[in-house]
Amino acid sequence: MKTKITLSGFAGTGKSTVGKRIQEQLNFEFVSVGNYSRQYAMEKYGLTINEFQEQCKAQPELDNEIDEKFRLECNSKENLVIDYRLGFHFIKNAFHVLLKVSDESASKRIRLANRSDEVTSTKAIQQRNQKMRDRFQDNYGVDFTNDKNYDLVIDTDDLTANEVADLIIEHYQKSNAVSKIPSVNFHLWQPCNMRCKFCFATFLDVKQEYVPKGHLPEDEALEVVRKIAAAGFEKITFAGGEPLLCKWLPKLIKTAKQLGMTTMIVTNGSKLTDSFLKENKAYLDWIAVSIDSLDEENNIKIGRAITGKKPLSKAFYYDLIDKIHQYGYGLKINTVVNKVNYKDNLASFIAKAKPKRWKVLQVLPIKGQNDNKIDAFKITDEEYANFLDTHKDVETIVPESNDEIKGSYVMVDPAGRFFDNAAGTHNYSKPILEVGIQEALKTMNYDLDKFLNRGGVYNWNTNKNQDLRKEEVSYE
């Protein structure tokens, strides 16, 4: 997994501005050989950068000295974005980017940035660029303008600095993708205000053994999200427990969105307020509401009720769905088919609700999660098939049998560990924040074919899922 990004290119490509934007988005440290040279010249020789550059003309070995020191420092660290034309040559374990710009655009950008110490005519820029190219070829025998030296080459003429940064982040994350399955469910919050008796993600074991509060601290949860994004996952679903009990859920959603992921929450709906819907519409793409039945008595039997006693009404669900549509979210409905509701007919409700996806899951026994109560809710394959047959005319239905569920989801538990359920129990990795994404994934048993066959890849980039990172930033 590459832990650094290097930026190369001629003057006027906006390397510094782009680098700082990437720093903000990926929480990387931004370093530049120019800033390093200024500091080094003053601390070691007591010279300004202009004085030092004049001395380098008489003593070319000083350039080599800077490159050697800078190379060693950068290679000793991780999570860097590096403004360095020779980064492709000297920096290891990095994603190398070349930024291109026409001489005319470079001249205009330098003038607009009011960099009084730089010449701005196109002829002067051409001469400066050629001298730079010749110097690197003479000193190191490399051509920093050769596209073949880079992982990504971008023509920046018609792009803003933000657009360039976004392209780099997108390609960097894809290059680092360590999972063939592009989506992940982060069960960040173990506590829940409902008491579904068949719940196959209670995480009582996790709470008892690892996180007594049932969740990570805010800063650690944010770091898990950053690492998930950096690993190349394209979509993240925040689940629980009940994720809306988490006060910092909006921060996690915003961070995930700014890092380029499609965002979703899975909620029982009881805490989905107008204020949440209004305040998060810029960063949250999808809302999945868990609705097993519209019959309040059935929901009490199931436990899908607040504290297990207060079910949500049919009117509540209809009103909630209207609000979700009103604010422009992509709507998904999840229904767990079990012994209590397998004879229900929800076709009329689904027709009115108009979800883009109606996921219909066969209730799933998971050892260590729902052993004590699952027997009363298990259904046969035939009973599950009957429910599907009742709703065969629903176009948006997405069935998931027990076999299709097991091993087909990439999931993270409330302690920040990957887990799978392929063997009918939870198998946990080491914590992501201790060993990293790649190492944590090694012990997981995820099945790409199952993921694809159950429809795990779909058009989650809806019109709601637009790029919200493009706040205009001028080149400096």
UniProtKB/Swiss-Prot annotation:
Annotated source species: Lacinutrix mariniflava (strain JCM 13824 / KCCM 42306 / AKS432)
Record family assignment: In the N-terminal section; belongs to the cytidylate kinase-like family. In the C-terminal section; belongs to the radical SAM superfamily. Viperin family.
Annotated ranges, domain Radical SAM core: 176-400
EC number(s) stated in the UniProt entry for this protein: 4.2.-.-
Signal peptide segment: none
Amino acids binding ATP: 9-17
SMART domains: Elp3
Taxonomic lineage of the native organism: Bacteria, Pseudomonadati, Bacteroidota, Flavobacteriia, Flavobacteriales
PANTHER family (alphabetical): RADICAL S-ADENOSYL METHIONINE DOMAIN-CONTAINING PROTEIN 2, S-ADENOSYLMETHIONINE-DEPENDENT NUCLEOTIDE DEHYDRATASE RSAD2
InterPro entries: Aldolase_TIM, Elp3/MiaA/NifB-like_rSAM, P-loop_NTPase, RSAD2/Viperin_antiviral, rSAM
Protein name: S-adenosylmethionine-dependent nucleotide dehydratase
